[in-house]
Amino acid sequence: MSSIRLADLAQQLNAQLHGDGDIVITSIAPMHSANGEQITFLSDSRYRERLGECQAAAVVLQASDLPYCNIPALVVANPYLAYAYMAQIMDTTPIPAQDIHSSAVISPQATLGKNVAVGANAVIESGVVLGDNVVIGAGCFIGKNTRIGAGSRLWANVSVYHNVEMGEQCLIQSGAVIGSDGFGYANDRGKWVKIPQLGSVIIGDRVEIGACTTIDRGALDNTIIGNGVIIDNQCQIAHNVIIGDNTAVAGGVIMAGSLKIGCYCMIGGASVINGHMEICDKVTVTGMSMVMRPITEPGVYSSGIPAQPNKVWRKTAALVMNINEMNKRLKSMESKLEDENE
């Protein structure tokens, strides 16, 4: 949608309108740059003083911030959530494909639902089942016997290997690879012997997978991504990982094989998580953490050393390098004190 009346937007957001509802909104913008045709939002009351300088046509805010506002406003309980829905309403992103392109290679043994679109040079192999309103972008590869649920969209150059199952309303960004071989090898006197990965990948409904993320197929059982999971760009999900419903994974995360993560977790960017263990529900792992042991209690977990001035970091590193020697000296001193007190 390219434009909308403020009153109509208020109705769709279930917001209270204050001011002229006939104003036409053309787009959304940050508060500092919004102009007289754009709407903005205030999600943090600490910045309410910016309302006095705001040049937007209207603003979305909480009721407690309304007295500080001198332009038309939409009052909601959660402005940031309203912003998300507002962005969906006004989204002008083109879909990955409009129809079935003449250069697409589609097996006669594939089954396509109603209103399926397939972009240029995409390959759909035999046994594939695409649900209604599925969109496959240009250059995608969909391997044998894979099933993709209704309403799912794949942007250009996504590779989905054989026997993968993907639910409804999923969104897969360009360059993602789903169902590639897990890293499975046996050692025969120094020679690596490949173990064919005989499992697959099962993806639930409403899952989003970022650009250039890889999800390996299981060795014997399946790699499983639960409903509502969101995975950012350039993540590595190894074979037999299980991610519970509505967990969020930020960019650059590496998950080793056979890891099980619960529901409603949040994994910060560039974190590394060991395999063959379990993380319970409702765990937050902050960015760049290294998780080596199971987590059995909900909460926030962190590791690593935040950036410091180089001189400070060098001193800290020197202390860490010498900590064993310092510990020996401390124990020696304690022993001497005990002897003196006897």
Curated annotation (Swiss-Prot):
GO terms for cellular component: membrane. The keyword Hydrolase does not apply. It comes from the Bacteria. Pathway: Glycolipid biosynthesis; lipid IV(A) biosynthesis; lipid IV(A) from (3R)-3-hydroxytetradecanoyl-[acyl-carrier-protein] and UDP-N-acetyl-alpha-D-glucosamine: step 3/6. The keyword Magnesium does not apply. Keywords: Acyltransferase, Lipid A biosynthesis, Lipid biosynthesis, Lipid metabolism, Repeat, Transferase. GO terms for molecular function: N-acyltransferase activity; UDP-3-O-(R-3-hydroxymyristoyl)-glucosamine N-acyltransferase activity. It is an enzyme of class 2 (transferase). The active site is at residue 239. Signal peptide: none annotated. Its EC number is 2.3.1.191. It catalyses: a UDP-3-O-[(3R)-3-hydroxyacyl]-alpha-D-glucosamine + a (3R)-hydroxyacyl-[ACP] = a UDP-2-N,3-O-bis[(3R)-3-hydroxyacyl]-alpha-D-glucosamine + holo-[ACP] + H(+); UDP-3-O-[(3R)-3-hydroxytetradecanoyl]-alpha-D-glucosamine + (3R)-hydroxytetradecanoyl-[ACP] = UDP-2-N,3-O-bis[(3R)-3-hydroxytetradecanoyl]-alpha-D-glucosamine + holo-[ACP] + H(+). GO terms for biological process: lipid A biosynthetic process. Belongs to the transferase hexapeptide repeat family. LpxD subfamily. Catalyzes the N-acylation of UDP-3-O-(hydroxytetradecanoyl)glucosamine using 3-hydroxytetradecanoyl-ACP as the acyl donor. Is involved in the biosynthesis of lipid A, a phosphorylated glycolipid that anchors the lipopolysaccharide to the outer membrane of the cell. Homotrimer. This is UDP-3-O-(3-hydroxymyristoyl)glucosamine N-acyltransferase. The lineage of its organism: Bacteria, Pseudomonadati, Pseudomonadota, Gammaproteobacteria, Enterobacterales.
